[in-house]
UniProtKB/Swiss-Prot annotation:
This is Cytochrome P450-pinF1, plant-inducible. PROSITE patterns: CYTOCHROME_P450. It is an enzyme of class 1 (oxidoreductase). The keyword Cytoplasm does not apply. InterPro entries: Cyt_P450, Cyt_P450_B, Cyt_P450_CS, Cyt_P450_sf. Induction: Transcriptionally activated in the presence of wounded plant tissue and by plant phenolic compounds, such as acetosyringone.
Length: 422
């Protein structure tokens, strides 16, 4: 048994999660700002009442887990392509090219050819073989961190672990990680509905810079032709003749982006949630066989991805409510992972709970996350090393808060020190 494995975060979340305010909203015109700051409480109120809400920008937020699973693979829907960008008035440029040419925002044969070259490299067997290398990365990070007292956990551990891992997988120079992570965290804002028009110039500039970096990496790999993932991938897709040069760039750009940003956020929140309950933290220190369960529950409780987009190809009836043909949908993972039908007392962070067989946070069907296994291993090994090397870790100042409700979410920084003596 895990001692005191559950925490009533519906009360305790005042430390570091979004505190509920009044939910007096129009369910057919919900402000994005309210969803970003009060998402959990809004979803908890409306999920029993109706299967979806409509956001102020016209996008429908699907709230219930069963409907999210259904619509993730339902032939009456498809993955969005450039619709969200066009909806925001973006019709060209580096960000538009990223959306237009990446496997994430494609369907059918186009999606298949863009994904196929990466699928083998991210198979469970291939990725599981990386576990020792990932564990080594965590140890090296703590060799340096144990020399300091107070430090920014988000920047110095949670960010570094996935960046160094993806650099290792792709054969990128480790010294490049500060450069590309800086760009990744700016570009990834385009995968959230919360970016403001005045922010787009910076997002676009960062996308241009990241695209140029990936292009140079591909050129360097072509000159050296080493026996690494990147060289093998480029050789395979070029022999198959399935991808254009811009598609090569965008698939690798997506891997760098997806492999860095979401794991960073998850590492911060899993650690914070475990630290919030000293008895749970002590149990994890004493029996690390519970680490995987803590990671799964952390990904449920505060998923780093708030929703997945789809497009309705026909009118779709959900429990008497109709999603109109042509509607842009956001399948709210954030809501579905707290659906009372599937989770008893979903507002509790409970490491001992039974999870659904397929974790909703990684998507569904042919678009299910390629990096699912890699993310889990990074989080598990990151937490294991943390428990062993920093057993007296303590948060200094404010606990981190999760921000956002759709696409990629963000966690505020977490400052820590290696002692409970504050």
């Amino acid at each position: 048994m895990i001692a005191n494995s559950s925490t009533d975060v519906s009360v305790a979340d005042q430390k570091f999660l979004n505190v509920a305010k009044s939910n007096q909203i129009d369910p057919d015109a919900v402000p994005i700002s309210r969803l970003d700051s009060e998402g959990h409480s809004i979803f908890a109120e409306w999920r029993p009442k109706r299967p979806f809400l409509r956001r102020e920008d016209g996008i429908f937020l699907v709230l219930r887990a069963d409907h999210i699973f259904l619509l993730g693979t339902d032939p009456r829907t498809r993955q969005i392509e450039t619709e969200l960008m066009l909806n925001r008035g973006v019709k060209a440029g580096a960000v538009f090219d990223f959306i237009d040419h990446s496997m994430l925002f494609s369907n059918g044969e186009t999606h298949g050819k863009r994904r196929s070259g990466l699928s083998k490299a991210f198979s469970f067997r291939m990725v599981e073989a990386l576990r020792p290398e990932i564990a080594k990365i965590t140890e090296c990070l703590w060799d340096d961190l144990q020399k300091v007292d107070d430090f920014n956990f988000t920047e110095m551990y949670a960010s570094q672990l996935p960046a160094l891992t993806i650099a290792s997988v792709l054969g990128l120079p480790s010294e490049d990680t500060p450069f590309f992570t800086r760009l990744v965290y700016k570009v990834s804002r385009c995968l959230s509905p919360s970016w403001r028009d005045e922010e787009f110039e910076e997002i676009e500039a960062s996308a241009i810079e990241l695209q140029d970096y990936v292009r140079s990496v591909i050129a360097d790999s072509g000159r050296r032709m080493r026996d690494d993932f990147l060289s093998r991938y480029l050789k395979a897709v070029r022999e198959a003749g399935t991808l254009s040069p811009i598609e090569e760039i965008m698939q690798l750009m997506l891997i760098i982006l997806a492999g860095s940003d979401t794991t960073r956020t998850a590492m911060v929140m899993v650690t914070a949630l475990a630290l919030q309950n000293p008895a749970l933290w002590s149990s994890l220190r004493g029996n690390q066989s519970y680490v995987a369960a803590a990671v799964e529950e952390g990904l449920r409780f505060e998923p780093p991805v708030g929703s997945f987009p789809r497009l309705a190809l026909k009118d779709i009836d959900l429990d008497g409510y109709v999603l109109p043909k042509g509607s842009l949908l956001a399948l709210s993972v954030m809501s579905g992972l707290r659906d009372e039908k599937h989770y008893e007392h979903p507002q509790l962070f409970d490491v001992g709970r039974q999870q659904m067989r397929w974790h909703l946070g990684f998507g569904a069907g042919v678009h299910r996350c390629l990096g699912e296994t890699l993310a889990r291993i990074e989080l598990q090994e990151g937490l294991r090393t943390l428990l062993r090397r920093a057993p007296n870790l303590a948060v200094v100042g404010d606990w981190p808060r999760m921000m956002g409700h759709g696409g990629i979410r963000r966690a505020t920084d977490m400052m820590v020190k290696l002692s409970f003596d504050l």
